[in-house]
Every structure is written in structure tokens, then in C-alpha cells.
């Protein structure tokens, strides 16, 4: 069946991995002769921007409309019968309090999730939190995980003399302050991709940490960063999924991540798990990665096998199955 899908995105974002996810899905769909296009809302995600988007944004004509993430409030105005909304995480709620938190929870998650018929979450953890927040049944939210976005390029050898620890992302949930404390005194270089706060920059200088810093990288730069990394850290306090886990595994790096959902499930046994709120736990994990070559080799190999389940063709197939279900339901309603 030939049909068209329109992916709807935010105007700008601090987490480009979300946009990369659905471009990978769209590439797979296009190879099957399914029409895809992307449109962005005209305004940002401030309170005024949200209400202007709700008032003024109208999606182009398409068989399937897919709210691709972090503009989930559009589910309040989009047609229910052929709209899918993907929820990546609810981390924004942890960064707000009082009336602002209440309003964001209602606009982004509660009201649109109750109104729309088709919802997906990128992990079981996000699904669980969404159904608790919105008060909706579990069967309404389909879990479709994120695909691996970069090509697998296994590292030739772990650098014993000058290992690089890669951290992609510096949002508050990424736990960079504790990571900085944890690498202090360890024989490694820290490569951070993302904007650092004044406090983080000062702390890096005070601790005399050897730093590689890139505020932003294009896709080629990200791929090179993973190829160069010996260790990839994602010791976040909270995640919707955790793409750096599988991106590190695909490139033969040893991954260190949090012993929390969904990160430990995404890692599939191919990572060192640490307590993200304990600097010593993170430091011990990095120290073990640097010193225990047998454990390192075994963990990297488990990670290499783990990434196969995130093949982009398989993830696209799951979205295609959902789209076909929506179209069948539409056809059934027309024939009544």
C-alpha cells in the first residue's frame, strides 16, 4: 500500500538525536516507496510559543500525521483518526515545579494522550511513566524503541595509555557535574559534547582534567567522536531511552551507564552499571573499565551483539505496522 507520512517537529531543539531518529525511520520508509516529509512548528516551546502553535499551526495534507516528539501538545488540535504521537520522555517535568509543572504536564502529556488514539513510547520506562501521568490504559501506548543511528565501526584497540571517555549531552539529567568529579585523578581524557555551564568549566579547570570540548557536532563529527572513544558514559539520572548506549556499543567502546530503567535494559548486559547519584560508584566503574581488560573485552562483545536488536529496518517495520493499522481502521470506518 502506498501512502504518505508527515513528521511534525519542534522549531528547534537541544537534543538533535530526536530529529535524527525519525529521519532514519523516514529513510527506511522511503525505500519502500512510502512518501515522507518533515515540517516544523513555527514557534518554540515557551508557554507563548505553545499557545501560538496550537492556534496557528495546521499540518499539511498526508495520510498519516506523526508528532515526532516534544511538541506532543499538538495532539490537542490534530485529527484523532490518523495522528500518531511519540513520547520520548517526561524529564521536562523534573525540571519544573508548581503551576508551571502542572500546566506542562497537562499540555504535553495528560490532555493530548487522553484525546489521541495512537501513542508510542520509546521505552518501557517512558510508557510506564506516561500511563501513570495521563491515567490511560497500558494497551493504548505502544513501545517502539529507537533505532541505531550511526554506522557500526568497531574500535581496533582500547587505548591503554591515553583512553578517551566520551560524554554526549549536557542537559541537567545527563549528570555531567558528577561525571566531572568522578574522572578527577583518573588517567584519561574527557570528551564532552554539549554546552558546559560556568560552574562545570571552572570545576574542570580546578581538577586539572584533560578535556576535549565540542559544543555541537554534525553527524560526521558525532560518528568520529564515537570512533575515537574508548569509553562512553551515560550516567544520567533519567532518560527516555539512551541512544549513546547503543551508539557506543556499535563502535566498540566500553559503555558505562546508570543502573536504572530504561538505560540498563537498553544496554542489554553490555555495559558497566553504576549509581548515577554516587560519584564513587561512577569513578569505580571508570576505574574498572581502565584496569580490567578481561571484563572490558567481554562487556564490549556483549554490547556489540546487543545493538542488532535496534536495527533501523526493524524499527521502521514496527512503525509501518502501526501506520497500516491506522489506515485499515480509517478504511473500516468509511465503509460503515
Q: Model-derived features: where do they sit?
A:
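Conserved acidic donor-binding segment of nucleotide-sugar-dependent glycosyltransferases
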Residues: 258, 272-280, 287-294
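Conserved donor-binding/catalytic core segment of Leloir-type glycosyltransferases
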Residues: 158-174, 180-185, 191
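Active-site donor-binding segments of glycosyltransferases and PAPS-dependent sulfotransferases
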Residues: 3-75
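Aromatic "clamp/platform" in nucleotide-sugar-dependent glycosyltransferases that forms part
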Residues: 235-237
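A short, well-ordered alpha-helix in the C-terminal region of glycosyltransferases
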Residues: 295-309, 318-321
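Short hydrophobic beta-strand element within catalytic cores of glycosyltransferases
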Residues: 245, 253-257
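Nucleotide-activated donor-binding/catalytic signature segment of Leloir-type glycosyltransferases, i.e.
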Residues: 194, 200-223
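Membrane-proximal helix-turn-helix segments that form the acceptor-binding/catalytic region
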Residues: 99-119
Amino acid at each position: 500500500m502506498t501512502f504518505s507520512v508527515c513528521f511534525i517537529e519542534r522549531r528547534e531543539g537541544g537534543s538533535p538525536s530526536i530529529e535524527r531518529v525519525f529521519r532514519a525511520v523516514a529513510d527506511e520508509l522511503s525505500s519502500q516507496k512510502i512518501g515522507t516529509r518533515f515540517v516544523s512548528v513555527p514557534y518554540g516551546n515557551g508557554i507563548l510559543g505553545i499557545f501560538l502553535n496550537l492556534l496557528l499551526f495546521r499540518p499539511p495534507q498526508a495520510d498519516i500525521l506523526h508528532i515526532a516528539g516534544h511538541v506532543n501538545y499538538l495532539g490537542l488540535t490534530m485529527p484523532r483518526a490518523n495522528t500518531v504521537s511519540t513520547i520520548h520522555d517526561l524529564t521536562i517535568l523534573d525540571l519544573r515545579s508548581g503551576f508551571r509543572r502542572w500546566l506542562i504536564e497537562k499540555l504535553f502529556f495528560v490532555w493530548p494522550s487522553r484525546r489521541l488514539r495512537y501513542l508510542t513510547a520509546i521505552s518501557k520506562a517512558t510508557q510506564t511513566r506516561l500511563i501513570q501521568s495521563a491515567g490511560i490504559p497500558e494497551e493504548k501506548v505502544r513501545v517502539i524503541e529507537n533505532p541505531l543511528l550511526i554506522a557500526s565501526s568497531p574500535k581496533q584497540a582500547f587505548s591503554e595509555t591515553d583512553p578517551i571517555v566520551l560524554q554526549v549531552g549536557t542537559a541537567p539529567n545527563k549528570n555531567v557535574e558528577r561525571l566531572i568529579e568522578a574522572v578527577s585523578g583518573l588517567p584519561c581524557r574527557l570528551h564532552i559534547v554539549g554546552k558546559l555551564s560556568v560552574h562545570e568549566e571552572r570545576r574542570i579547570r580546578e581538577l586539572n582534567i584533560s578535556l576535549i570540548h565540542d559544543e555541537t557536532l554534525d553527524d560526521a563529527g558525532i560518528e568520529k567522536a564515537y570512533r575515537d572513544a574508548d569509553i562512553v558514559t551515560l550516567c544520567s539520572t533519567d532518560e527516555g531511552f539512551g541512544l549513546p548506549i547503543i551508539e557506543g556499543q556499535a563502535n566498540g567502546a566500553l559503555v558505562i551507564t546508570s543502573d536504572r530503567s530504561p538505560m540498563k535494559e537498553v544496554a542489554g548486559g553490555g555495559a558497566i552499571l553504576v549509581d548515577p547519584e554516587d560519584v564513587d560508584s561512577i569513578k569505580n566503574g571508570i576505574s574498572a573499565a581502565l584496569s580490567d581488560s578481561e571484563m572490558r573485552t567481554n562487556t564490549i562483545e556483549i554490547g556489540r551483539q546487543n545493538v542488532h536488536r535496534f536495527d533501523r529496518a526493524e524499527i521502521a517495520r514496527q512503525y509501518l505496522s502501526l501506520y497500516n493499522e491506522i489506515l485499515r481502521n480509517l478504511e473500516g470506518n468509511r465503509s460503515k
